[in-house]
Amino acid sequence: RALRAEAEQALAELDAEISQAKARGQETAYAEIYPYLAQVAFHSRLAAFWQDRAAEQRQALSLLLAGAREAKRELVAVAQGKAAARVVPPLPDYGKLEIRDGYFRSGADPALIFAMLYNDHSALQRWFANSETGYEGALVAGGDRFNVERQPIWQAYQQYPDTHRVGWDNASALIRDEGSWEVIGPPVIICLESPHTLDAIAKMIEQFEREHAGDRSHLVQNMDFEYAYVCYCERTRQMWARWLERKYADVRKANAIWATTFEGFSSVPMPRPEQAGKNRALWFDWASFNLNRFVNHIKWTGEQVRRWEPRKPLTVGSPYYAFDPAFWTGIDAEELTDSGVTGVVLEENYALDTLMPEYLHALAGHQPVEDFEYHGVLHQILPSFLHGDAAISMWWWNSAMHWTPNEPINEWTTSFPQSYTIPLSDLAKAMRDALDVRRLGREIAALGSAPRPIALLYSKSCMLQQPPKESAEIGTFPYLSSLRGIYNASQAAGLYVGLTTEKKILSGDLAQRKILVLPGAEFVPGPVRDAILDWVDGGGTLIVSPDSLLADEYARPSDTLGKLGLKMVRREPAPLKHGETVVTEYNADELPRMAFTTNGVRLEAVGARQVLECAKTEVSGRFQDGVPAVVRQGRGRGQLYWLAATLEPASWRQFLSMVARQAGLEPELQVTAEAGSTAEYVEYRVTELQGRHLAYLYNNSDREAHLILKTAFAHRGMLDLRSLAPVEGGRLLVPARETAIVEFQ
């Protein structure tokens, strides 16, 4: 009772100070967070039966007490001229924003959008943007799981058997199966190849576009997301045969690649996922075909929309599948982005890192990347903007509880005001971050759009070459695990690290890169391999992580090792203890470390190991048993580093930094930790904006980081742009899971 009375008194005093500040014309948005949270804490929060309600209440009251007092102190300090005011611009009018150079813009300035889902007209817009950035309809399918009975596709599905999917009973949002969330009804799993399906979809699109004609209050028209598609109908078989004929022209050429004896393309079967491992060359073509035919349907959908709506930017996608073994069933984000259908790149990130926004940023070109339903962790919202996102709507903030069929009861644990798992401090952080994203849009966009001189290869061939059934249980496979692991380990190296693709490499993307990393990219097409090696000869630096470049896209052995003068004597598997097939972050700690030294730096590797033979002069480091750990070759004006085993994260950061220095990439900012602290998990980058140097520092750990910043450029002082407090003596405290943005003056 005493704590509640104290908190209520502090909130009352803050309310009075807010009123006075408003009368002075002072910004009060940050201070208003705590009175609003008090209403949430007292009227909306749920508690699980196993929780200590008294302890939960004390925690909430303590937060409100401390927050209210600090907010009052800040208002008073600003009024007395002792602190700078953090002035937040108004929320943008979506009808007046333009798309230009990867962002939604008001004039020249980027308008970054941080919204909470399902809040389009509420008091929450004091802090968060309107989450209705787009108007949405399941146009690709002609309906969704909620409204299918009211759409033309329903009648077609009842009347024409060829509208029914064949050989695949998972709707994946096209349209409804027995496991569909929040709805009860008979399965409606459509075939997109049927003319009756296409006719019904076209009618639905016409109706939808007529209803939304003249819309000027949204940024984009969303043709929906979370789509995946597979069908084994007769029309698909005919499409498959025609696709193969266009690709190969002569079936003998295809037979030579597949090691088969088909008499014609019409006799080539449609492989099932469980058969993928039996003929991986044939599977690669089938998986490629499935991606292609789905993108073609998306293009057709876009053409139908453009009959009625010629201008509104469109978006659609299933980016989740870009990092999933089921990639072959989804929408190919690269081909979709290059197709001209979309004006905004759609994102939906579930992962606990920034790999997806970084990948989509690499594909987007001048299109903004917008996450329409962010399911990641709160502390990576701001880093996601710093990796290229232009807009994010976070899941979710519902103002009233309700229940619908097939909805898991624990879904309410993810709604911010009701959740008993999301602490009240996270609500306060989200509200502060939303204000800072709006206030610092120019600086965040500059940091997020800076050039990436280092790139990791996102290999579509590797994604398609994984037999789905082999990786379905754990949701990953060696290439995908290596890509994510190396990407995350690279973040604390102080260097801009992006992604490139096989298609982009063939289009000359490496001309803007200094370093390319192959993260276990085993299956790489020959022309891509050759383009990479030519780039190295011209002065590039290549890091090859095992088991890259061992085969082509059809899983046929590659001659890369021979071309490089290397020989693999054998491959020693990782000593996994529980029957696993992949080394991941979850089992790596159980494995022995393999130490070696290169260029005076002691490093450790983990997992499988390649035993290589090469010229002695090319060995840059050896394991303790004398086996080469790193091979370094000079090729023309460039350098190639071949790692015989995967480095553990801290060693990878050291190795990447060492290679970067040798390639002429010296970080402009050095970040070290004060005694008793660590900078090991601090991600940081530096860029320039209109003559100013800017940096962000993201502390991706559960401990506060006491940092020392040293620059390679001259400056008079440093300013923490989030707090508007000076960084004295280059010493900066970054709390756990927080991000600082610093201006060097």
Model-predicted segments: where are they?
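A short, well-structured beta->alpha microelement
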Residues: Y118-L124, A322-P325, A489-D509
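Hydrophobic targeting/anchoring helices
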Residues: A71-A84, G179-G185, E309, T315-G485, ...
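Short acidic, Pro/Gly- and aromatic-enriched capping/linker segments at domain boundaries
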Residues: A79-F104, E234-W243, A615-V631, S723-V727, ...
